[in-house]
Structures are given as C-alpha cells and as structure tokens.
C-alpha cells in the first residue's frame, strides 16, 4: 500500500485507507487535497493550508462535494510529549498555567 505521485489516484480503490495525510510542500497541498477528496478519502493537511485563498476555497469545496472532512493541523499536537503536557495541564499537575 505505497502510493507515489504517479499512482496516487489509485488510492480510491483501497478501502483500508480512510484518511490521507498531506505533508507535501505547500504548493502541492491544494492539488493533493482535491485528488484525495475525489478518491473518497478524508484529508488531514499540514499548515499552512495553501498558497492562496482561492486554493483554500477549492480544497474546501472539493471535500464538501465529496462529503469528506478536511482538517488543517500541525503534527505537534499529536506528538507524545505534547499529549502528555496537555494531560498534565488538564489535571492541574503543573499549577495554574498562564501562557503556552
């Protein structure tokens, strides 16, 4: 289950893939987000979303049309150290947090 730039669109035929994580250079975010949506996959795209507001809108519209979620995120929120810090803050283990 390895996909390249050349065979990316064949991802639509793989029911084991639910989500595509877009970690390409920002100039390719719109193209591959739209291709993933057309393939019927949800999309998690690294920030920044795209180079232009127009590309952002195209990404949103492609995912809406396909009925798929589009999420823009930064990988840091999923790193173990950061997840642990969030839990400690919520439990009050670090005292009153004033700024992060």
Regions found by a protein language model. Name each.
Residues 2-7:
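Conserved SAM-binding strand-loop segment of SAM-dependent methyltransferases
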Residues 78-100:
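Oxidoreductase and adenylate-handling cofactor-binding alpha/beta cores
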Residues 8-10, 76:
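Short, solvent-exposed coil/turn elements at secondary-structure transition points
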Residues 19, 25-26, 30-78, 92:
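Beta-strand-loop-alpha-helix segment that lines the small-molecule cofactor/substrate pocket
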Residues 13-16:
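Alpha-helix C-terminal capping/helix-to-coil transition sites in glycosyltransferase folds
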Residues 18-19, 99:
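Short, Asp-centered acidic motifs that coordinate Mg2+ and/or phosphate
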